[in-house]
Amino acid sequence: MGLRGYVFCFLGLAFLLSLFQSFEMLILSDESRPTPAQDRHLTRDLTQRYDGYFRKYTRTYFGRMPWKWFKAQSIQESRLEPNAKSSAGAMGLMQLMPGTYKEIAREIGLPPTPYDPRANIHAGIRYNLECLNFWTERRSWQEKLRLMFASYNAGSGNIVRAQKVVREQNFCSGRRWDCIKQGLPHVTGRHSQETIHYVDKVEYYYSMLR
């Protein structure tokens, strides 16, 4: 087989791998998406719970941004359960790690317990602002939100490293989340799918709450 043949074989394999990954992501996304009955439960039975806190602290840190973005995030994080605790140790409605909550609580004078709904929502929205402010390059508001939520889930440093990967390999400009997420598997491995689905789910829940 000549050089041209090897090149075509390589490109063909790369295409098939890309197709398989896209198909796998679609399956995972469908499997992780709640059923219509679960959606009705989340968006009807829990509509009023903690809404005042989401409104208050969204207004404090994000002005006129729709507060339901953070409620959607909390649905994804904890299903709006104030006593939720993940296997990794994240706690409360906004699933903050102990160190993150402790640092923010010390800065803004919150109670030491992360399971207090008001304090946890306050700290979570405050942490979102830190994640948002990390991204200073000019982008649309929607793109900034996606990067904010991705940073909240995976850490801003990991998202920056993913951006560096796609820029170094000339995948794309690295300005849009749809581009940056292509580099995330090179940074966080199998956990990259969790972050990609996380952003999708927050947007999905927000669309259900509107």
Regions of interest found by a model, annotated:
Residues 49, 65-70, 75, 88-91, ...:
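Extracytoplasmic
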Residues 84-104, 167-171:
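Short, surface-exposed glycine/acidic/tryptophan-bearing loops
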Residues 2-37, 41-48, 102-103, 107-126, ...:
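Non-catalytic cell-wall polysaccharide-engagement segments
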Residues 78, 90-91, 98-100, 115, ...:
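Acidic/His-rich structured neighborhood in mature extracellular/periplasmic domains
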Residues 58-67, 137, 141:
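Short, charged helix-capping/linker segments at alpha-helix termini
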Residues 46, 50-61, 69, 84-85:
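Peri-catalytic and regulatory segments of divalent metal-dependent proteins
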Residues 71-75, 95-98, 150, 200, ...:
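Generic alpha-helical structural context detector
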